[in-house]
């Protein structure tokens, strides 16, 4: 029954933010959100349904809230009359304004009066429009919950579309080898880790080859990843640039592989101290990459990829964890940190 409750996606705005959507005053928010939806639909490989924007008098004037179904998946405040100044590496001047944590990346930032923009920029701050702050947050939330936004109807629409060019493939795989609900489950699991599902032909061909193996939904998703990861890597770093990678030290990796082998179905049980150290090191490496405009990904042994990913994503929303079998051969990489579980080594 999870199909029904997911369908409603909305952004609720406090009364002070209504001007951001007012067509008369040229409020750009609705167009910007449509742009985000189209971009993410292209990246993820399915049409992301529209997001309703509506006012909500129970919210504070500057508050907004993002909902999927009944669940609140994000809320924060923006100041339409101000701009958000985000410090760079070299920013040493303290700006006067409203100090906040920026919602998408959790960085300290300051809402400054609009006329102070030039001064802020001359001190190394990046200055962002309020609409951009909100749409970036919306984009992050849709990406994070993409798996939950995909329903069986959406998958059927993707299949109908593919059937125009590959009718025999579609007929021979769904529902003969895989029922629609299982395929939906597999695609949702891929999306939950940002894996694009746009190459549906390849997905069905691979699933047809795996059909005799009796794999679970999770195992099927895992088996599909190496064939799809090239698309994801391309979205993270253009081909001309090396991919910024965080790895584990071989000692730590071997230890985790042993733990997974021993615990079997229970998955990876890390003691808190080790988990905390790892998360902290990964976080700081990732933040260093962000400061240089790169997005870092983790690359680990396929034997622990899935378990490790679910632990890490629990703490660091947008960290992508790839198995080393998933990296395209030709791809240049740049290892920016090696996590040892002791204290981190920077490269």
Task: Enumerate the predicted regions with their spans.
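Structured cytosolic domains appended to multi-pass membrane proteins
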Residues: 6-332, 338
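A polyampholytic, Gly/Pro-enriched intrinsically disordered region
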Residues: 339-347
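Short, small-residue-biased leader/transition segments that mark boundaries at the very start
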Residues: 1-5
């Amino acid at each position: 029954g999870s199909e029904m409750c997911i369908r409603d996606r909305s952004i609720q705005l406090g009364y002070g933010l209504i001007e951001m959507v007012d067509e008369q005053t040229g409020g750009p928010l609705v167009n910007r959100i449509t742009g985000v939806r189209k971009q993410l639909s292209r990246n993820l490989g399915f049409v992301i349904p529209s997001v309703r924007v509506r006012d909500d008098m129970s919210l504070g004037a500057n508050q907004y809230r993002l909902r999927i179904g009944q669940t609140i998946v994000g809320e924060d405040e923006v100041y339409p009359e101000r701009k958000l100044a985000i410090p760079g590496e070299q920013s040493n001047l303290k700006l006067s304004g409203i100090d906040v944590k920026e919602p998408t990346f959790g960085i300290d930032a300051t809402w400054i009066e609009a006329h102070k923009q030039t001064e802020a920029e001359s001190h190394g701050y990046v200055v962002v429009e309020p609409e951009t702050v909100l749409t970036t947050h919306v984009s992050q939330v849709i990406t994070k919950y993409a798996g939950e936004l995909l329903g069986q109807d959406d998958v059927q629409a993707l299949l109908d579309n593919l059937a125009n060019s590959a009718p025999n493939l579609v007929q021979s795989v769904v529902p003969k080898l895989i029922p629609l609900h299982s395929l939906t489950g597999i695609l949702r699991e891929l999306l939950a880790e940002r894996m694009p599902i746009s190459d549906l032909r390849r997905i069905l061909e691979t699933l047809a080859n795996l059909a005799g193996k009796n794999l679970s939904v999770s195992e099927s998703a895992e088996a599909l990843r190496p064939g799809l990861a090239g698309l994801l890597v391309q979205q993270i770093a253009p081909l001309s640039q090396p991919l910024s990678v965080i790895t584990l030290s071989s000692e730590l990796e071997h230890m985790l592989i042993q733990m997974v082998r021993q615990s079997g179905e229970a998955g990876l049980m890390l003691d808190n101290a080790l988990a905390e150290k790892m998360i902290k090191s990964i976080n700081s490496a990732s933040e260093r990459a962000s400061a240089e405009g790169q997005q870092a990904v983790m690359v680990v042994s396929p034997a622990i990829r899935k378990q490790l990913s679910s632990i890490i994503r629990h703490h660091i929303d947008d960290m992508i964890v790839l198995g080393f079998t998933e990296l395209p051969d030709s791809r240049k990489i740049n290892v920016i940190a090696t996590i040892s579980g002791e204290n981190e080594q920077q490269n």
